A protein has these predicted regions:
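Conserved nucleotide-sensing/catalytic segment adjacent to the nucleotide-binding pocket
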Residues: 48, 61-105, 116
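ATP-dependent NMP and nucleoside kinases share a basic, alpha-helical "lid"
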Residues: 104-153
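P-loop (Walker A) phosphate-binding loop of NTP-binding proteins
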Residues: 29
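Short beta-strand-centered segment that lines the nucleotide-binding/catalytic pocket of NTP-utilizing
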Residues: 45-60
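Small-molecule kinase domains that catalyze NTP-dependent phosphoryl transfer to phosphate-bearing small molecules
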Residues: 104, 126, 155-173
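Hydrophobic positions on the alpha1 helix immediately C-terminal to the Walker A/P-loop
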Residues: 37
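Extreme N-terminal, non-catalytic leader segments
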Residues: 1-24
Length: 173
């Protein structure tokens, strides 16, 4: 019930934003429901979703220093050049998503950019991006539920990666 009220209140707040390109960043802890919330908001309000997972850092740029930074696994430079300059234009654009199965850039992802644009994923509100969004949403989750969701989504083997690497970096962020 609480999540339905949260969703309805958020959707109503977003409807009240001025009618131009409305940019909403959905950040939060892993497995907190960022992707699910973005999909529900698009279904309710329309718009585009840009996934921060599409900006995974390519292997050639992974240095120990970069990987030790909170958010260092995000290819900020590409997000800053391919997405941010285009968000307020009101014109369609595209960016290339990172394909983790090939560890290389993959298909072009079109963004209609004529209403709501939801930028979802961990580090979508990172200070390196500045204050590009009209609204910030941060989703929290308790540790037990987080572990259960990661185990279900990624499997037991990958859960250990999250517990030892990704969650500590997100907590530092």
């Amino acid at each position: 019930m609480r999540s339905r009220r949260f969703f309805n209140d958020l959707a109503e707040e977003l409807r009240e934003l001025p009618e131009e390109v409305r940019i909403i960043a959905i950040d939060g802890r892993c497995a907190a429901g960022k992707t699910t919330l973005a999909a529900r908001l698009v279904k309710e309000l329309g718009g585009d979703v840009i996934h921060m997972d599409d900006f995974f850092l390519p292997p050639a740029l992974r240095t120990p220093e970069r990987r030790s930074e909170p958010g260092g696994n995000v290819h900020y430079e590409r997000f800053l050049t391919e997405v941010l300059p285009n968000l307020r234009s009101g014109r369609p654009f595209s960016y290339r998503r990172f394909d983790c199965s090939r560890m290389a850039l993959g298909e072009e992802m079109p963004v209609e950019n004529n209403g709501y644009v939801f930028v979802e994923g961990a580090y979508s509100c990172h200070p390196v991006f500045g204050d590009y969004m009209d609204r910030r949403v941060f989703l929290d989750i308790d540790g037990k539920t987080q572990e259960e969701r990661i185990r279900k989504r990624n499997g037991e083997d990958r859960l250990q990666d999250f517990l030892q690497l990704w969650i500590p970096l997100e907590e530092a962020y």
